[in-house]
Structure formats: structure tokens, C-alpha cells
């Protein structure tokens, strides 16, 4: 499969599922690390929480998918190396993205958004990015749409 086809396939899944997986792990982290009552507050504002996670997580997830799709065959074909690269890439790309957003200050106009992007909430950004990168890198080859036949190349062989 060509790199461009892998980028498109991975991009759709990473951008949609990546932030949602991150939210799932973040909610579990808050439930077990903090008081469970905090989870009730999050459930009350879950639509805003999901929107915030997608706005802060879709672009890093998309960039992580491009990185995973462009891995050399030797690394990309082995699950463990692909998961390691996806997890590290997810963390690094998310931190770079958040640093750029904080410096631009264009998107960080609200107090809630600014608190999430501040250095105080490093764990809140790193854990979901790491786990979403690992999980998505692990399951991306099993998701439908990867083995799409192309009529132009099928007729040549």
C-alpha cells in the first residue's frame, strides 16, 4: 500500500478516534487518581469536554497518524515498534502543538482552554496522548478500509 493511501486511511481514524480514546483514558485517570466526585462534574459538561478534546487533540492526532503512516516498512510492520513510535510521537507532537498554541494565544482565549494548555496540567495532556498513540498504532491495521483495491493498479498487474 502506498504511503499516501496509508496517510489518508490512518488520518481519518486517528483524527476521529484518537481524541476520544484520550478522553476515555483521561476520565479513567481522573476517576482513580482524584476524587470520584470530580467525575460527576466532568459528566455534566461532557459535550464541552469532548469538544475541547477534539479541538486540542485532532490536529496532534492527525500529525501522529502521518508519522505512523510514514514509518519505514521494517518498523511499521512490527506491532511493538509501531506502538512505541505512535506513543512517543503522540506525546511529542501534542506537547509541540500545545506549546505553539500557548505562544500564539489565539485559541487560548478562554480560561478553561488556557488551564488545559498550561504547564500545570502536563499529566492531563501526556497520558491521553501516549495511550491514544499506542492504542491507535496497535489497532490501525485491523480497522476496515486498509485493503481497498485500486482499479488503476489492479488492471496493470
Swiss-Prot record:
Periplasmic face residues: 33-36, 105-115
Chain segments annotated as transmembrane: 12-32, 37-57, 84-104, 116-136
Residues exposed to the Cytoplasmic side: 1-11, 58-83, 137-157
Key word Acyltransferase present: no
Membrane topology reported for the UniProt record: Multi-pass membrane protein
Keywords recorded for this protein, A-Z: Cell inner membrane, Cell membrane, Membrane, Transmembrane, Transmembrane helix
Cellular component terms (Gene Ontology): plasma membrane
Localization terms from the record: Cell inner membrane
Family (UniProt): Belongs to the CbrB family.
NCBIfam families: PRK09823.1
Name of protein: Inner membrane protein CbrB
Gene: cbrB
Amino acid at each position: 500500500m502506498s504511503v499516501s493511501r496509508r496517510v489518508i486511511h490512518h488520518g481519518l481514524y486517528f483524527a476521529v478516534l484518537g481524541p476520544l480514546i484520550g478522553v476515555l483514558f483521561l476520565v479513567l485517570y481522573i476517576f482513580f487518581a482524584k476524587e470520584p466526585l470530580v467525575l460527576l462534574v466532568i459528566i455534566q459538561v461532557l459535550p464541552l469536554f469532548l469538544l475541547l478534546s477534539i479541538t486540542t487533540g485532532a490536529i496532534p492526532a492527525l500529525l501522529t497518524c502521518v508519522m505512523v503512516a510514514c514509518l519505514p516498512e521494517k518498523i511499521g510492520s512490527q506491532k511493538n515498534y509501531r506502538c512505541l513510535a505512535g506513543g512517543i510521537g503522540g506525546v511529542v507532537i501534542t506537547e509541540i502543538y500545545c506549546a505553539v498554541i500557548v505562544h500564539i494565544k489565539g485559541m487560548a482565549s478562554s480560561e478553561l482552554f488556557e488551564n488545559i494548555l498550561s504547564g500545570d496540567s502536563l499529566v492531563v495532556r501526556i497520558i491521553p496522548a501516549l495511550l491514544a498513540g499506542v492504542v491507535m498504532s496497535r489497532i490501525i491495521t485491523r480497522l476496515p478500509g486498509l485493503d481497498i483495491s485500486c482499479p488503476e493498479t489492479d488492471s496493470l498487474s
